[in-house]
Amino acid sequence: MDDENATLLTEFVLTGLTYQSEWKIPLFLAFLVIYLITIMANLGLIAVIWKDSHLHIPMYLFLGSLAFVDAWLSSSVTPKMLISFLAKSMIISVSECKIQFFSFGISGTTECFLLATMAYDRYVAICKPLLYPVIMTNGLCIWLLVLSFIGGFLHALIHEGILFRLTFCNSNIIHHFYCDIIPLLKISCTDPSINFLMLFILSGSIQVFTILTVLVSYTFVLFTILKKKAKDIRKAFSTCGAHLLSVSLYYGPLLFMYVHPASPQADDQDMVESLFYTVIIPFLNPIIYSLRNKQVIDSLTKTLKGNV
């Protein structure tokens, strides 16, 4: 009987960020402003890089790709979340849930690979400056980007395939503001052990690989910087500082989610942490990279003056 009911399940109910009605309109307005700025800032950064031929180098190719993924990541989650603030109950169909989960999975994993790729690019630029044009060719850069997106696609596809083979009959209420894997596994009436195992193996491997790539790259960068003159040190730190800040902000909440114990309070913490890297990080990244990058600021200023 449970399997029959599970087969007939056509929708989930998202609990959203808050039950308190007095907070819904203020939160809607706040996140609407954040989302609009996120989209405009990331697309604006892409436009600046596209328009200025001086920025057609690997570093900015990766930065433009990161801006695209940030806009995609935010758009996978935020529009539905905004609707939830205005609706009495947040119902999402199983088909919509699958699409949201898949879209979020691709963009989130691709961002991890892009951050690692950008760290490697900085390593080559600072540690092997004379060989940089030889190593970071257009072909290699495009290949690294393609691999990042393929990795994100395959990772999301595998989890999507094994997740929605489960049956959901315990409840159709997802304690989250979007269709995330852990809240979905919690309401499954089928044994999700294989899902947790694959989550540990695949997601864990990706996290370890990308974090190690960043750490090893910047360890070599740090040792190289310390041998340089004060002027060169400042220039190197200005180049790497934005990326290091972005990596710290992205991986901090992500790693914390895996180490704190499971509890009802932890579920609420997970929502706050998810909110940080799905909404806040895509909002902050273009600001961080623009304000700390003189070439981007100069190009943006030139573009704005040209349009006046």
Curated annotation (Swiss-Prot):
The family this protein is said to belong to: Belongs to the G-protein coupled receptor 1 family.
Recorded hits in Gene3D superfamilies, A to Z, give: Rhodopsin 7-helix transmembrane proteins
A single GO molecular function term of this UniProt record: olfactory receptor activity
Name the UniProt record assigns to this protein: Olfactory receptor 5H8
Subcellular location(s) of the protein: Cell membrane
What membrane topology does the annotation report for this chain?
Multi-pass membrane protein
Write out the transmembrane intervals. Answer: 29-49, 57-77, 99-119, 134-154, 196-216, 239-259, 271-291
Tree of life domain:
Eukaryota
Q: Name one GO cellular component term.
A: plasma membrane
Q: What does this protein do?
A: Odorant receptor.
Query: InterPro entries of this UniProt entry?
Result: GPCR_Rhodpsn, GPCR_Rhodpsn_7TM, Olfact_rcpt
Q: Which residues lie on this side of the membrane: Extracellular?
A: 1-28, 78-98, 155-195, 260-270
On the Cytoplasmic side, which residues? 50-56, 120-133, 217-238, 292-308
Disulfide feature: C97-C179
UniProt keyword list: Cell membrane, Disulfide bond, G-protein coupled receptor, Membrane, Olfaction, Receptor, Sensory transduction, Transducer, Transmembrane, Transmembrane helix
